[in-house]
């Protein structure tokens, strides 16, 4: 996990990890972030496309952006922590 100091985005690199590890790492990063803090999750597990939006809805965080590379092998999610 790294922090981009220019934009205050915490980056969670979950490449190579399988369910449920990417969401567990995301949950930990969100818990440590301040309200309105941004967390970017980068993952290769295709189940994150289903799990991350559900995680955000369930815990009422804002999914700002969701992208996949052209091959669909790399997934990126930008989440804003809500109060």
Residue ranges and their predicted role:
Residues 2-14:
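Right-handed parallel beta-helix/beta-solenoid
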Residues 7, 36, 72-74:
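A general secondary-structure signal for short beta-strands and their flanking turns/coil
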Residues 7-10, 62, 77:
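Residue-level marker of intrinsically disordered, low-complexity segments enriched
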Residues 12-68:
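Amphipathic, hydrophobic secondary-structure cores in small proteins
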Residues 69-83:
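C-terminal edge-of-domain segments
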